[in-house]
């Protein structure tokens, strides 16, 4: 079995393991080793021949070589701005655009730009209506794989994101982030008109309609319009006669939860008299 006389040569052997030229180098090495044994020579020129080989060509943005497993080393590319390291040059290039603000991939439909081509491809589905990711359970389709993954948790009941304060769980991380503001009191979304602040962006959007007068949700029965979809749905129950909120004390039902709450207070007072 072929052996290496020094640790340096063993290290070189590991570096050459993934190189196409390794086969030719080792063939020559075996020949020299056999020849030295036959002649009884104590000198071995393989070490010098290995040293003469150019084992690696370091790029300016390359860091040190980190060893993942014995004999195999991986080049690491480091961001000169923040020090974050990457195993692929392309990943570093993509990351650096965060610092430079460069967004070379532009949507031909609306002009919006993106740092990564993959993000542009996903965005363009807004314009094309393409939804390639379909739920096997209910058939609903999505433009993003991540959106499908979150949706599937409706069927599985999985809620992997838990609040550390109250242990309430959520299907996605963004909902958890919004929930945390209940505990922190943070309201980062502020109305430019009146200064009122909100914990959710959607709540601010709905609030702004109070100032603009915009009522985008119209009743299909009477064409009455509303600021929110929820209020429109609630109004629709007047036409359908649906009264899903039932008083447990007297059996009277209501179209709105708020109406039931008001009724229950007076109902309780009557029963205690």
Swiss-Prot record:
GO cellular component: a single term: nucleus
Pfam families according to UniProt: zf-C2H2 (PF00096), zf-H2C2_2 (PF13465)
Zn finger region (C2H2-type): 77-99, 105-127, 133-155, 161-183, 189-211, 217-239
Binding residues for Zn(2+) 2: 107, 110, 123, 127
Annotated compartments: Nucleus
Binding site residues for Zn(2+) 4: 198, 201, 214, 218
GO biological process: regulation of transcription by RNA polymerase II
UniProt GO MF annotations: DNA-binding transcription factor activity, RNA polymerase II-specific; RNA polymerase II cis-regulatory region sequence-specific DNA binding; sequence-specific double-stranded DNA binding; zinc ion binding
Binding-site positions, Zn(2+) 3: 141, 144, 157, 161
Gene3D superfamilies associated with the record: Classic Zinc Finger
Chain sites annotated for binding Zn(2+) 5: 247, 250, 263, 267
Family, per entry: Belongs to the krueppel C2H2-type zinc-finger protein family.
Function of the protein: May be involved in transcriptional regulation.
Protein name: Zinc finger protein 32
């Amino acid at each position: 079995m072929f052996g290496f006389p020094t640790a340096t040569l063993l290290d070189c052997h590991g570096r050459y393991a993934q190189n196409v030229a390794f086969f030719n180098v080792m063939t020559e090495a075996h020949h020299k080793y056999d020849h030295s044994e036959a002649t009884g020579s104590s000198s071995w020129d393989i070490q010098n021949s290995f040293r003469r080989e150019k084992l690696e060509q370091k790029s300016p943005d390359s860091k040190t070589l980190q060893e993942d497993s014995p004999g195999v080393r991986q080049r690491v590319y480091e961001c000169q701005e923040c020090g974050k390291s990457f195993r692929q040059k392309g990943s570093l290039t993509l990351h650096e655009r965060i610092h430079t603000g460069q967004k070379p991939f532009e949507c031909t439909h609306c002009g919006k730009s993106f740092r990564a081509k993959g993000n542009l491809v996903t965005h363009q589905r807004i314009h094309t209506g393409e939804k390639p990711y379909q739920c096997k359970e209910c058939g609903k389709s999505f433009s993003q794989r991540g959106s499908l993954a979150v949706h599937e948790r409706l069927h599985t009941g999985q809620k992997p994101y838990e609040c550390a304060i109250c242990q309430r769980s959520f299907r996605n991380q963004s909902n958890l982030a919004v929930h945390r503001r209940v505990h922190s009191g943070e309201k980062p979304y502020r109305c430019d008109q009146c200064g009122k602040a909100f914990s959710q962006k959607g709540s601010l959007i709905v609030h702004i309609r109070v100032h603009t007068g915009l009522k985008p949700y119209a009743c299909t029965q009477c064409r009455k319009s509303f600021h929110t979809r929820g209020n429109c749905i609630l109004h629709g129950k007047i036409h359908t006669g649906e009264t899903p909120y039932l008083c447990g004390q007297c059996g009277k039902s209501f179209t709105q939860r708020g109406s039931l709450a008001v009724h229950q207070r007076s109902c309780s007072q009557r029963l205690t008299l």
